[in-house]
Every structure is written in structure tokens, then in C-alpha cells.
């Protein structure tokens, strides 16, 4: 068991990036425990997050560093970064400004499966994305 | 915004599996909000989870279905399954028997980064894995 804890290694040595050089980061509200989103980090974005204490991810769709909130203002102040037993998933405890989700909800997990396997909204709309990101053309 | 919510689709139609046919599932304690682990599901394990209301994953290391707790007894009763805005991450709200982590902790996220970028234990040991899984040869 002691071996599995890897406590002799540094935090950055313990992180296992996948074959794309990415690691998933679960993002949780520090105070309420609500899970807000999951995003991906490469080493550069993780180092920037550790340095600035603001969540920074790797955008797989835009293929670039993504300082959370740089467009929307909805920043995440990072209090703690935890790592799982296998070293291949991170958990960020944050204070979220506004909503985390680009659709306008507080959490990206704003829909849940019903018994009949349709979906229902289970979260609060925080902003109108057209006001924040502009209208889609 | 309405388009992004995809509320006209069924839950299963909304899930986007990756190129390996897998989707990550974050697992959170239903009562306390503690994040316990992240695992991966394929369609079969997701359908089994929906059917049995017990968490079932796809083990990438063993390449087979993995009914959580089948070896350890540490089952997860599933209360709700949420899906994120992009449809590519799930969030399970569960009641966890014993510890979720094979190392013996309540959560797989039992280590956190310190200011000096070493790690410290931040969780409770629930069982001795040698008692549960046997000694490693």
C-alpha cells in the first residue's frame, strides 16, 4: 500500500498525462462541494494554474491554452489541487465567479437522466450566453 | 442557447463516447458532495448502471466490465446520473459502501499538492487493501 501512495515523489512527477499529453481536471466548488465542470490540462496549463492560482486549461476544440473566464469573466480561483490514486485525474477546488458553463448554467452538469431516460434541468441559469459571448452567426 | 440544451434528445442519445467508445464518469457522494473517484464507461456498462442502479464501469487495465465492489464489497448505489453541456462527461451521485479507492482510502483523491509542490494526505484510510484484495506476490 505504501508504494501506491507515492508520497516520495513531487506532485508534478506524480501526474500522468495521457498519450495526447493531457490529464482530466474535475472542478468542484470549494464551499458547496458542487461539481461544476470537467476540463483537460496539459503540463503548461497545470503549471500556469499552480503559478497564478487561477484555473487554466487546454482547449481541445481551439487547440490552445484557455484561462477560464478570459472571455466571460467567470474566473475560477483555485484553492487546492488533489490527485487520484493512479495519478491520471486531478480535482480542483475553486471559487467560481458567475456560472462555469458556457450555456449559462452554474454547473456544466445542468441536466440529469430521468427514470424514463429523458433529461430534466437540475441547475440554475446564471447568465444569457449571447450577452457574454455575443450572438452566434 | 436552447439548441445547446438538447432537451429533445434522450439521455442515451446525448452521451458522446470518445474514439475508444468510452465516456468519463465522475463519482460523487450523494449526501456529502465528496468526489470519490473518476472511472470510464462504455455503452454496456452505462446501460448496466442504469438498469441495476449499481455503478458499473469499463476497466481499461483489465479490458472488461467492472461492477464496482465485486471484489471488495465496496458497492456504489446510484441515485442520479447527470450529463455535461458537451455530452462527453457524466456525473454519478452515489451512496458508497466503505472506501471507493483500491488503496484503502474513502476517496481516490486522498493526496493534495502542497505549496512546495510535494503532496500531503488529505483523506481517511478505510481499509487495508491486503485484507480485501490479498497480498501482492
UniProtKB/Swiss-Prot annotation, chains A, B:
EC number(s) per entry = 3.5.4.19
- Compartment(s): Cytoplasm
**Entry's cofactor comment:** Binds 1 Mg(2+) ion per subunit. Binds 1 zinc ion per subunit.
Alphabetized GO MF terms: magnesium ion binding; phosphoribosyl-AMP cyclohydrolase activity; zinc ion binding
Keyword Zinc recorded: yes
Primary location class: cytoplasm
Q: How does it assemble?
A: Homodimer.
The family assignment reads:
Belongs to the PRA-CH family.
Describe the task this protein carries out. Answer: Catalyzes the hydrolysis of the adenine ring of phosphoribosyl-AMP.
> Under what name is this protein listed?
Phosphoribosyl-AMP cyclohydrolase
Organism of origin: Pelodictyon phaeoclathratiforme (strain DSM 5477 / BU-1)
Q: What is the lineage of its organism?
A: Bacteria, Pseudomonadati, Chlorobiota, Chlorobiia, Chlorobiales
Q: Which gene encodes it?
A: hisI
Amino acid at each position: 500500500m505504501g508504494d501506491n501512495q507515492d508520497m516520495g515523489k513531487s506532485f508534478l512527477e506524480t501526474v500522468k498525462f495521457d498519450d495526447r499529453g493531457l490529464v482530466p481536471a474535475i472542478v468542484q466548488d470549494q464551499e458547496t462541494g458542487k461539481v461544476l465542470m470537467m476540463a483537460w490540462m496539459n503540463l503548461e496549463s497545470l503549471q500556469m494554474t499552480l503559478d497564478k492560482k487561477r484555473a487554466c486549461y487546454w482547449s481541445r476544440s481551439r487547440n490552445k491554452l484557455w484561462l477560464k473566464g478570459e472571455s466571460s469573466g467567470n474566473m475560477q480561483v483555485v484553492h487546492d489541487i488533489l490527485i487520484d490514486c493512479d495519478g491520471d485525474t486531478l480535482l480542483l477546488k475553486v471559487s467560481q465567479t458567475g456560472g462555469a458553463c458556457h450555456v449559462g448554467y452554474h454547473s456544466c452538469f445542468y441536466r440529469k437522466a430521468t427514470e424514463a431516460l429523458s433529461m430534466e434541468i437540475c441547475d440554475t441559469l446564471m447568465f444569457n450566453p449571447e450577452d457574454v459571448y455575443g450572438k452566434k452567426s
